[in-house]
Amino acid sequence: MSDTEYLARAEAVLAAVERTVDAANDGDHDIDLERNGSVLTLTFENGSKIIVNLQPPMKELWIAAKAGGFHYRFVDGEWRDTRTGTEFFSALTDYATQQAGLPITFRA
């Protein structure tokens, strides 16, 4: 994957996360979303955070959550955890639901 392809795919992920948080905030959620360059910080009502950021040199996406730190690479059309193979949006859904205390579903 070229640098240009990586950036397009990775930025699409960040945009999808932003859209999901905006929609969730229209409902029962109160999630603060801050974007600083290629870093998204989601802050939940209980003060816990999830950070999603791009890692261009490695062509990866990273998630930092209470559950730990996770690295994702684009494989066969999806962002997959480099250790477990878990799909990015599925994992983010699990981490955010745990930290928010309310269900929230992330999709591409």
UniProtKB/Swiss-Prot annotation:
Domain of life from the UniProt record: Bacteria
Keywords of this entry: Iron, Metal-binding
A GO molecular-function descriptor: ferric iron binding
Entry keyword annotation includes Metal-binding: yes
UniProt cross-references to InterPro entries, sorted A to Z: CyaY, Frataxin/CyaY, Frataxin/CyaY_sf, Frataxin_CS
Example of a GO cellular component annotation carried by this entry: cytosol
Pfam families the UniProt entry points to: Frataxin_Cyay
Keyword set includes Metal-binding: yes
Gene Ontology biological process terms from the UniProt entry: iron-sulfur cluster assembly
PANTHER family assigned: FRATAXIN (PTHR16821), FRATAXIN, MITOCHONDRIAL (PTHR16821:SF2)
Alphabetical list of HAMAP family matching this protein: CyaY (MF_00142)
Family named by the database record: Belongs to the frataxin family.
Protein known as: Iron-sulfur cluster assembly protein CyaY
Source organism (scientific name): Burkholderia vietnamiensis (strain G4 / LMG 22486) (Burkholderia cepacia (strain R1808))
